[in-house]
């Protein structure tokens, strides 16, 4: 089963639409230069009103370790996503089971480099200029297939209701992460596009999932709470 995360949530109404229609996780961006930045105090109030089964992911870009930990506790986050230039030594400051590391061809996402990181999963996104994701550009699916062969993979980068089924079919990621592809403006999600993405993923699963696959033990889940804390 392909898991689904919607990122860049800024409004409770959008978050509830995603959660109530089956999203596995929601992402909150704590990078002040992002148009989808959400102050920790506002994020905390929003998160408190979410259904308990939804996983809360905090997205950080080149932030001080202690600041990440502070926001993690203030907001009641479940997982931490590092979306900047954080090196393996920085990442080791966090328990691997609760860490998602975003990578892109520009920041050296080859298999040899990935071996140096300890994390729950890699998130493949497209980076343009000084922007750390959320650009709407399609990521490198060939690289995604290579990463998927060895690591749990979240596929991001330009996904929307029209192409998410094709992306899953080509890359076979453990999860997909959608941001600008379901927006009417940065940080403002379109409820119908959210529902359309979720419906498209369900259609794919219904078409591709065989009886034999249903009998297999459930595979590793990325969006799941862990016993690890920071």
UniProtKB/Swiss-Prot annotation:
The protein's annotated pathway: Amino-acid biosynthesis; L-tryptophan biosynthesis; L-tryptophan from chorismate: step 3/5
Keyword Transmembrane helix attributed: no
InterPro entries: Aldolase_TIM (IPR013785), PRAI_dom (IPR001240), RibuloseP-bd_barrel (IPR011060), TrpF_fam (IPR044643)
Source superkingdom: Bacteria
Catalytic activity of the protein: N-(5-phospho-beta-D-ribosyl)anthranilate = 1-(2-carboxyphenylamino)-1-deoxy-D-ribulose 5-phosphate
Keywords: Amino-acid biosynthesis, Aromatic amino acid biosynthesis, Isomerase, Tryptophan biosynthesis
BP GO annotations: L-tryptophan biosynthetic process
Keyword Signal found: no
Sample GO molecular function, one term: phosphoribosylanthranilate isomerase activity
A Pfam family it matches: PRAI
Enzyme Commission number, as recorded: 5.3.1.24
Cross-referenced HAMAP family: PRAI (MF_00135)
NCBIfam families: PRK01222.1-4
Protein family (similarity comment): Belongs to the TrpF family.
Protein name: N-(5'-phosphoribosyl)anthranilate isomerase
Organism: Syntrophus aciditrophicus (strain SB)
């Amino acid at each position: 089963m392909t898991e689904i995360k919607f990122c860049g949530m800024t409004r409770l109404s959008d978050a509830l639409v995603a959660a109530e229609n089956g999203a596995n996780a929601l992402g909150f961006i704590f990078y002040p230069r992002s148009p989808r930045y959400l102050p920790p105090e506002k994020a905390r109030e929003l998160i408190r009103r979410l259904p308990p089964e939804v996983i809360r992911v905090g997205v950080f870009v080149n932030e001080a370790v202690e600041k990440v930990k502070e926001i993690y506790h203030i907001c009641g986050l479940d997982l931490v996503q590092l979306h900047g230039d954080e090196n393996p030594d920085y990442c080791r400051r966090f328990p691997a089971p609760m860490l998602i590391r975003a990578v892109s061809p520009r920041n050296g996402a080859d298999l040899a480099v990935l071996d140096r990181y300890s994390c729950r999963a890699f998130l493949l996104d497209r980076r343009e200029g000084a922007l750390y994701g959320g650009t709407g550009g399609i990521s490198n699916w060939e690289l995604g297939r290579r990463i998927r062969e060895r690591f749990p993979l979240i596929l991001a980068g330009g996904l929307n209701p029209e192409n998410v089924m094709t992306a899953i079919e080509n890359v076979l990621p453990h999860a997909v992460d959608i941001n600008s592809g379901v927006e009417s403006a940065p940080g403002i999600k379109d409820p119908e596009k959210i529902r359309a993405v979720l419906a498209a993923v369900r259609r794919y699963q219904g078409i591709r999932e065989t009886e034999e696959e249903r009998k297999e033990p459930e595979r590793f889940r990325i969006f799941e709470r862990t016993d690890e804390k920071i």
